[in-house]
C-alpha cells in the first residue's frame, strides 16, 4: 500500500471520504515525514500540535457529514502569508519572531474549507530570489539530485520550500506567491505543478508585499487535478484587497480532462533564446506535438517586446519593493540595532536586518524612483510593460487560446552555483516567466520530462485573463502524455 503521505491530494480526499483512514492518521504520516526530512530545510516552523488539533476537528466534521472541500487535507504555507498566532518572517531577520494578529484571506479560505496546517515553508527573503538561497533561515535543499552526483541542488525560488515540500511528500499541497516566476520556476525544478492565477483572482490581503502590482498567490501540488482543487479554495473576491476582482470562481476540477479539440496554441518565436538548453528545446517541441495529438491547433506567434521583459521587470519590481519595504524600521518588532538617534537606529536596523539581495533591490528601486532618473527608468519601464501586455492582447485577439513556452531555461542548478559573482546570472532564470506577471495573466508550470541527468523539466502554459480553466485542460493533456515524475530516491531519510 502507498504510504499515506505519498497519496495525491485527490487520492487522500477520496480515502478520507470513504473512511479508509482518518485525518489524524494522514496528518501524522506527514508530520513523521517532516521529522525525517529536516535536512531539506523546507519548513521554517512546524505546527504539529495545531495540525493534529485541526485534523481531529476535520474527523468530527467528516463523521457528521459536514466535510468541507479540503476537509482533513494537510498543507504547508509559504512564510509570506500571515497566519494568526503563528510566526511569520518572510524569510528575513528584520521581521524576527513576528507573530501576526490576523490571518491572510487565502489561508483563511483554506482553513474554512477544512485544510490542515502543517507549518510555515521556507522562501527567499521577502520573495526576492530564484533559488531559495537568500532566506535568513538558510537555503532549501531540493529533494532531487543529479544522477550519480550527491551535490545539493536548489529547488528554485522564491517559493522553494513549498516546491520541495510537495515534491518530497512533506505536504499534500502548498501555497506559494509568484511575482516574476516564484511558483512556476520552482515547480519546474522539482517536478511539481504550480499555477500563478490571473492578477486579482486571489486576494493579496495578509500576504507580505514584495511588488504589489505583480504579486499573486497560487498553489503547488503533485498533479494538475490537485492544483485545480486547491485553487478553487484559494481564489475569490475580497473587499479587503482593492485589486481583487469580483468574479465568480468556477469549479476548476471540472476543467481537468475537458477536451482541448479546436484550441489554438501559440508558440512565440521570441522565446527561442540563445543558450536555451537543447533538452528543453526538444521537450518544448514534444509538448506542442502532444497538444496537436489531442486536437489542438499549434501556430507560430510573435510577442515582439519579450526581449525587454527582464529589464522592465527589474525596474518595476525593485521600485515597488523599495516602497513596500520602507515600513520596516525595527520600532515595533523584529531586528532592532541601537543608534545615536532614531534616524541612526533606522539605518543600522535596516542594514543589519535585510540580506544582501534585498538591500540590492531596495537600492535599485530607490535609484530608479529618484528625481533624476524617474522618467528615464521607471516611467519608461511602465510604458514598455503596457507594450508587453498589448503583445498578448493582440495574440489573443487573433484567436489564440493559450501560449506554450518552456518554464525555465535550464534544469535545477547546484547551491552556490549561480549569481555570486554576477546577480544578472540569477535574474536570467526568470526569462520565460516575468512577462506573465507584467501582463497580469495566468500561467501554469507542468512537469514534462527529465533531463539526461534525471532532473525534472517543466513546460509553461500562459492563458487569457481569468481563463485558468483552459490552462488546467491543456496541462492535463501534458500530464497524461508525459506521465508524472515523483522523487524516487528519498535519500534524506
Curated annotation (Swiss-Prot):
Active site residues according to the UniProt entry: 78, 158, 182
Pfam families for the chain: Amidase
GO cellular component, one term: glutamyl-tRNA(Gln) amidotransferase complex
Superkingdom as given in the UniProt entry: Bacteria
GO biological process: translation
Top EC group: ligase
InterPro entries in alphabetical order: Amidase (IPR000120), Amidase_CS (IPR020556), Amidase_dom (IPR023631), AS_sf (IPR036928), GatA (IPR004412)
Catalyzed reactions per annotation: L-glutamyl-tRNA(Gln) + L-glutamine + ATP + H2O = L-glutaminyl-tRNA(Gln) + L-glutamate + ADP + phosphate + H(+)
Coiled-coil regions, chain positions: none
Keywords, comma-separated and alphabetical: ATP-binding, Ligase, Nucleotide-binding, Protein biosynthesis
Recorded GO MF terms: ATP binding; glutaminyl-tRNA synthase (glutamine-hydrolyzing) activity
E.C. code: 6.3.5.7
Described purpose of this protein according to its UniProt entry: Allows the formation of correctly charged Gln-tRNA(Gln) through the transamidation of misacylated Glu-tRNA(Gln) in organisms which lack glutaminyl-tRNA synthetase. The reaction takes place in the presence of glutamine and ATP through an activated gamma-phospho-Glu-tRNA(Gln).
Assembly description: Heterotrimer of A, B and C subunits.
NCBIfam families in alphabetical order: gatA (TIGR00132)
Family: Belongs to the amidase family. GatA subfamily.
Protein name: Glutamyl-tRNA(Gln) amidotransferase subunit A
Source organism of the structure: Azorhizobium caulinodans (strain ATCC 43989 / DSM 5975 / JCM 20966 / LMG 6465 / NBRC 14845 / NCIMB 13405 / ORS 571)
Amino acid at each position: 500500500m502507498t504510504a499515506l503521505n505519498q497519496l495525491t491530494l485527490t487520492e487522500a480526499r477520496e480515502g478520507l471520504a470513504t473512511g479508509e483512514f482518518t485525518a489524524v492518521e494522514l496528518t501524522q504520516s506527514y508530520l513523521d515525514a517532516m521529522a525525517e526530512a529536516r535536512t531539506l530545510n523546507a519548513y521554517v516552523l512546524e505546527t504539529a500540535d495545531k495540525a493534529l488539533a485541526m485534523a481531529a476537528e476535520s474527523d468530527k466534521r467528516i463523521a457528521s457529514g459536514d466535510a468541507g472541500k479540503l476537509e482533513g487535507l494537510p498543507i504547508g504555507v509559504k512564510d509570506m502569508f500571515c497566519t494568526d498566532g503563528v510566526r511569520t518572517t518572510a524569510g528575513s531577520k528584520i521581521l524576527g519572531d513576528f507573530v501576526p494578529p490576523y490571518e491572510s484571506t487565502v489561508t483563511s479560505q483554506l482553513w474554512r474549507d477544512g485544510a490542515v496546517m502543517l507549518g510555515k515553508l521556507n522562501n527567499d527573503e521577502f520573495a526576492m530570489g530564484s533559488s531559495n538561497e537568500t532566506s535568513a533561515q538558510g537555503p532549501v535543499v531540493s529533494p532531487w539530485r543529479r544522477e550519480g552526483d550527491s551535490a545539493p541542488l536548489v529547488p528554485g525560488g522564491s517559493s522553494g520550500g513549498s516546491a520541495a515540500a510537495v515534491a518530497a511528500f512533506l505536504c499534500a499541497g502548498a501555497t506559494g506567491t509568484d511575482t516574476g516566476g516564484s511558483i512556476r520556476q520552482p515547480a519546474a525544478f522539482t517536478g511539481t505543478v504550480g499555477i500563478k492565477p490571473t492578477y486579482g483572482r486571489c486576494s493579496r490581503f495578509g500576504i507580505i508585499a514584495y511588488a504589489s502590482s505583480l504579486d499573486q498567490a497560487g498553489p503547488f501540488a503533485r498533479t494538475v487535478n490537485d492544483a485545480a482543487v486547491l485553487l478553487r479554495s484559494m481564489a475569490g473576491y475580497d473587499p479587503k484587497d482593492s485589486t481583487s476582482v469580483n468574479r465568480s470562481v468556477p469549479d476548476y476540477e471540472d476543467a481537468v480532462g475537458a477536451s482541448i479539440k479546436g484550441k489554438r496554441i501559440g508558440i512565440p518565436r521570441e522565446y527561442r533564446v540563445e543558450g536555451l538548453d537543447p533538452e528543453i528545446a526538444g521537450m518544448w517541441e514534444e509538448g506542442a506535438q502532444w497538444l496537436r495529438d489531442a486536437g489542438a491547433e499549434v501556430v507560430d506567434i510573435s510577442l515582439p517586446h519579450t526581449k525587454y521583459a527582464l529589464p522592465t521587470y527589474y525596474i518595476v519590481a525593485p521600485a515597488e519593493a523599495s516602497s513596500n519595504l520602507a515600513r520596516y524600521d525595527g520600532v515595533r518588532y523584529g531586528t532592532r540595532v541601537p543608534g545615536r538617534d532614531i534616524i541612526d537606529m533606522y539605518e543600522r536596523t535596516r542594514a543589519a536586518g535585510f540580506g544582501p539581495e534585498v538591500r540590492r533591490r531596495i537600492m535599485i528601486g530607490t535609484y530608479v524612483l529618484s528625481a533624476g532618473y524617474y522618467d528615464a527608468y521607471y516611467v519608461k519601464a511602465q510604458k514598455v510593460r503596457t507594450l508587453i501586455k498589448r503583445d498578448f492582447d493582440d495574440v489573443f485577439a487573433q484567436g489564440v487560446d493559450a501560449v506554450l513556452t518552456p518554464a525555465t531555461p535550464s534544469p535545477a542548478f547546484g547551491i552556490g552555483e549561480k549569481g555570486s559573482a554576477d546577480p544578472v546570472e540569477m535574474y536570467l532564470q526568470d526569462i520565460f516567466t516575468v512577462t506573465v506577471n507584467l501582463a497580469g495573466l495566468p500561467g501554469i508550470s507542468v512537469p514534462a520530462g527529465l533531463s539526461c541527468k534525471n532532473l525534472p523539466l517543466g513546460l509553461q502554459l500562459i492563458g487569457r485573463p481569468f481563463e485558468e480553466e483552459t490552462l488546467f485542460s491543456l496541462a492535463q493533456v501534458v500530464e497524461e502524455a508525459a506521465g508524472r515524475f515523483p522523487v524516487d530516491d528519498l535519500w534524506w531519510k
